[in-house]
Design a protein with these regions (language model features):
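Phosphate-binding glycine-rich loop
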Residues: 30-78, 92, 102-104, 126, ...
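Conserved active-site segment immediately N-terminal to the catalytic lysine
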Residues: 162-195
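PLP-dependent aminotransferase-like
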Residues: 69-155, 159-164, 171
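Conserved core segment of the aminotransferase class I/II
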Residues: 190, 194-215
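N-terminal "arm"/small-domain region of PLP-dependent enzymes with the aminotransferase-like
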Residues: 1-31, 36
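PLP-dependent aminotransferase class I/II
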Residues: 9, 21, 38-43, 51-54, ...
């Protein structure tokens, strides 16, 4: 017997009445772009993560790119990402003319290793780059080591974008990633912890200025 990775048809069968009613409501009011459902969803996300601003977008890849643009990264900036992650984490960086630096992962968690991160930051400086942004990636529902990453980032004056596409809603030391990061991003691709039918993404921040830039 084959078991599908994700069975949206089965899910729809279970939620059919609610989904059909929601679609009918949208068709009735006719506000297809940034309608009331979007604002309600953003408010629910914001309340769930206890974060000031939740801004939805097309997908998780766009969320990462928009986050980097909001932080005004540029040529010769070094962006630190784990070596074990989905392609999107790396592929958005060249669009900003910055350079990705890959950080080794902890063999027990597969998340970014703090010792390797510090070593890679020092290496980037020796290569003539300016350490700019760390992008830890939550993986398999497990939050990255945000406490130690935040302490290192504060010492080095580096900003943090948390990629929570594969760990949305996870906590570490009793806190969501949004409490450690300048910006957090997520994806609503169907296979993600909070998935949609199609694709979608969101950006979270407690910084009013960053939120204004993203809007």
């Amino acid at each position: 017997m084959a078991i599908e990775f994700i069975n949206l048809k089965k899910q729809y069968d279970l939620l059919r009445k609610d989904i059909d009613r929601a679609i009918k409501n949208v068709l009735s009011h006719g506000k297809y772009i940034l309608g009331p459902e979007v604002k309600e969803f953003e408010s629910d996300l914001s309340n769930f993560l206890n974060v000031k601003h939740a801004i939805t977008c097309a997908n998780g890849t766009d969320a990462l790119l928009l986050a980097l643009m909001a932080l005004d990264v540029k040529n010769k900036d070094a962006i630190f990402i784990p070596s074990f992650t989905f392609a999107s984490t790396a592929e958005v960086i060249p669009y900003t003319n910055a350079t990705p630096f890959f950080v080794d992962c902890d063999p027990d968690t597969f998340n970014m290793d703090i010792t390797s991160l510090e070593r890679t930051i020092n290496f980037s400086r020796r290569q003539g780059f300016e350490p700019s942004v760390i992008i830890p990636v939550d993986l398999f529902g497990l939050a990255a080591d945000y406490k130690n990453i935040k302490e290192l980032a504060n010492r080095e004056n580096i900003r943090i974008i948390g990629d929570s596409a594969q760990g949305f809603g996870s906590k570490i030391h009793g806190k969501y990633s949004s409490e450690f990061c300048d910006i957090v991003t997520t994806s609503f691709f169907p296979a993600k912890p909070l998935g949609c039918y199609g694709d979608g993404g969101a950006i979270f921040t407690n910084d009013n200025n960053l939120a204004d830039d993203l809007l």
